[in-house]
């Protein structure tokens, strides 16, 4: 591809990004005011400048967008407060991106460590790689984060109206806590299994997305699983020893640590926004302040330890950003981000915006008996899945992990079938779906 072709492609991509975000902001206003928005819902965003190349390959179309996500589920309700807040934010057109080393916090790190700016600081603007796919905006506070999301392609159809999500999972946490108390053996056995290496990405991601509902014991196991997964990625996707140490120290949120560091960018001309961007995923993230002082002056031993092993401005920028996000990462759609690479779903867009499985949404509204049954079946199925995964990986050679998978699955079944093991199933019947 010659320079002229690259210019045309870059210009087309930039125009698409701008129009898509203008459309998104207009739709936010409409959702809040209740006004009609029919004409521009079917307008051609890119005016034939970009064709939806390979769209059929992803089994995607404009209507494939969370059609069933607006439920009575308390974690998935449209938030008027979120829509109101969005109107006070100036969302940047993220057509020009910069590497994470361009954060102010990262630049100060380069100066203080007397590092070569040429070696560690790359200020060249990068064209946004996004062409079509998942388009979102994450903002709010750590206490109350919000997410706007929609599917965006060349044609913005009326079915692509964005959803405004407020993370409110207090009742789900209480329900999960009661389920764990009523079935402690199952949770304890699955903790020991989750802490073993080489579990499938689907199992890991499922529990990463349930992380905020879990007890401390199970949260610790999720972090161990994330650490084991990331150890296999060091040297790829921007992962370094810093990121492994961060996972070991349970720093940040596990959802955000699964984002490949090389896909995180600064937005040119904006100090309050960063983004995660790939060819088929783009999410703008509002951060109030990414300050190097918060890292340098922190008395938190974990932050001090992580800061001491930063080798360059990009690593320090990632550390400062992760610290600034805090628990806002709890609503980051990590499954949508990984879906286009790992093909986790048959659909182009995940069926649930907040959880890995659509059925996980029932934890917010189900009774304790149903939740206990659901988690039991989940543990059994995933232990079996891990066993099959290890068999394929080692070509049916017996391994300690595959043996443990069967043992835990059988142990759970025995415990579940024992008299009195389930307070909700008097006759000890197998749980229903």
Curated annotation (Swiss-Prot):
Its main location: Golgi. It is found in: Golgi apparatus. Keywords: Golgi apparatus, Meiosis. Coiled coil: none annotated. Residues 401-433 are annotated as: Disordered. InterPro entries: Meiotic_expression. Residues 401-412 have a biased composition (Polar residues). Pfam families: UPF0300. GO terms for biological process: meiotic cell cycle. GO terms for cellular component: Golgi apparatus. Has a role in meiosis. Belongs to the UPF0300 family. This is Meiotically up-regulated gene 131 protein. The gene is mug131.
